[in-house]
Structures are given as C-alpha cells and as structure tokens.
Amino acid sequence: MRLVNLMTLTIPALALSGSGLAAQQAEKIEITEWDVPWEESRPRDPYVAPDGKVWFVGQRGHYVAWLDRETGEFKKFPLDEGTGPHNLVVGDDGTVFYAGNLVRHIGTLDPESGEVEKFWMPDEAARDPHTLVFGGNDDLWFTVQGGNFVGHFVPASGDVHLVKAPEAGSGRGSSSRPYGIKMDSKNHPWIALFNTNKIATVDPETMTLTTFDLPDERARPRRLVVDSNDVVWYVDYSLGRLGRLDPRTGEVEEWVNPSGSESRPYAMAIDRSDRIWFVETGVRPNKFVGFDPTTEEFFSVTEIASGAGSVRHMFYEEDTNSIWFGSDANTIGQAKLPPPRPRTTTDH
C-alpha cells in the first residue's frame, strides 16, 4: 500500500443557472424494465459484456447475474453469503470483476464456470470496495467509501495500491466517502468525495491525490462523468444540482435540476454526443433526466414506470445508444436515447 500527499486547488466563485426546462416541453424517452426473479435483492450497476449479455450484482442477494435482453432469461451466480457486491465491470475477455463491499475484496468471476478468485485489500481499513472502473493499461481504479481510499488494481499481478483520501469533519464519521469514479482521456481517475464539497483526481505516475473544492460548502457530489474534452460533470445529491468543473481553469457552473433542491440526483451517465443523463431519486416515481451542454438546457424528463425507488449507477452502451440501470424496485432497465448529435470538441 502507498500513502501519498494531498494537494488542494481553490475554485473560483460559483455560477448558478436555472433549470431552463418547462415540464410540458420535456422530451420523453423509451424505458423498458425487466423484473429480476430474485425478490428484494437490490439489482444494480449493470454492465454490458462483449457478447451483449447484461451483467449486474444483487447487493442484498449476494450474487452476480446476467440478463439476456432478447429472451428475458436470467442466470445467477451465487457468491458467499454476506459478500454484499456493490458494483461490477466486465473485461474484453468476458471476465467479471465485482466489488465485495462487505468483505474487503475485489473478486473475479469466470462467466462460463462461475469460478471466483478473490483479491484482498492490503489494509484492513479498506473494508468496503465500492465502485470499479477500467483504466487504460489493463488495470482498474476503484473507490473505498467508508475506508476512505482510492484504489488501483492490476489483475495480471494481483497488486493493489491504496491512496488515502482526505478526512472530513461532517456526517457519517471522518471519511470523505470516495464514491463515484470515472477516467479521463489521460488515464487519470476522477472521484466524487460524497461527504465533502470536493472532487478529487489521482496522478497515476506519482499516485498523488489532488482535490478541487466546490464553491458551496453544502455541496455533496455523489456521481460524476468526464466528457470528450476532459471536463468533469457531477450531480450534487444534497442541493439538487448538476455541475460542471473545468479542471484547466477551475471554473464551476451549476444548474438547478428540473425537480429542484429535493431532487436527490444519483445515477449518472454520458452518451457519445456528450449529453448528460441522470436520475432524480428524491421524487416518486424517479425521473430520468437529460441535459444538453451545447444549449445548456434540460431537454428530457421521463418517469420510470416501476417507480425505481433509487437508481444508483448506470452504464452507457454505445452500440445501441442506450443506458442500462438497476433499480430498488427490483428491475433492470434500458433507456433508449434520442439519436446522437454532433458534439463540440475543445483543444487542450
């Protein structure tokens, strides 16, 4: 394990915009949901494998499973009782990587045999691996929410390096709660520190963690995405906002969500047109929202038929221009997006 120094960058004053959307003008999208056959298992964090199967975890049911979208067939691979899998990703060879959130490991699952191999965290304090993302060098980066780390995992060697995140002085202990994580084009991970008003990144060469302070101390970024210009977009769960952070200038701009300050935006994705999508979980039913950075407008709001309860994480499938999600209503869903639009690129 390597512990590193922390750097902090100061962000200029916040620019806050209104929602820019009238309810009657909102564009609707088609959402299909499949009922998961294992009741109250909290299916979540789907990921589409190279063969088209939709893999997901059952956080409360302690399993990994897949859905065949064409036939509606499900297949379950039970994990050890008490594993609490929180998230998964699938490699190019079909290998499934899952976060054993309650048992301090990252596991791999062979999609044919169901055989599991476990890679343990090198520090017992890293008790709850949370969200995984592939890097660009046959590696993975991940968050450890309660344990307060950002991690780097090399499957070929089994090596795990942990970077300590900053301490926080508010709510749910001292952990800054590293939560959502995504990669930029330079293979740097970006992390939402959910118990703070900070967004972090790690230099993969030095393993130094740098934080960006968001201007509103009440902000609580939960999930984020990185666009084609390496601009970071995040949802502020506490204040009901969508935010944009430009790491080159430190400029922050935010928009009030269509459902307002109590919208509780959670799961997030970005499509190949750089349009931003997220789910408002503070309203019933949950609402699937689209934002166009070009016009700076929320252009799409669609209610999720099951109600959803909460949608926690999403996966964009470029081949079908759709987003996959799991819901607390015990469903796996597919949101079919409007046709892609040209995106604007910036030299940097």
Where does each model-flagged region fall?
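A short loop-to-beta-strand structural motif that recurs across blades of beta-propeller domains
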Residues: Y63-W66, R104-T108, N148-H152, K198-A200, ...
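Bacterial N-terminal signal peptides
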Residues: M7-S17
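Conserved beta-strand positions in repeat-built beta-propeller and related beta-rich domains
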Residues: V54-R60, V96-R104, L140-G146, P189-N195, ...
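Beta-rich, blade/repeat-based domains predominating
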Residues: E39-P50, E81-D93, E124-D139, A168-K186, ...
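A short helix->beta-strand "capping" segment at the edge of beta-propeller domains
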Residues: Q24-E40
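Beta-propeller fold detector
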Residues: T32-D35, K75-D80, E117-M121, H161-E167, ...
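Short loop/turn segments that connect beta-strands within beta-propeller blades
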Residues: D68-G72, D110-G114, V154-G158, D203-M207, ...
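Blade-level signature of beta-propeller repeat domains, shared across WD40, Kelch, NHL, RCC1
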Residues: G309-H348
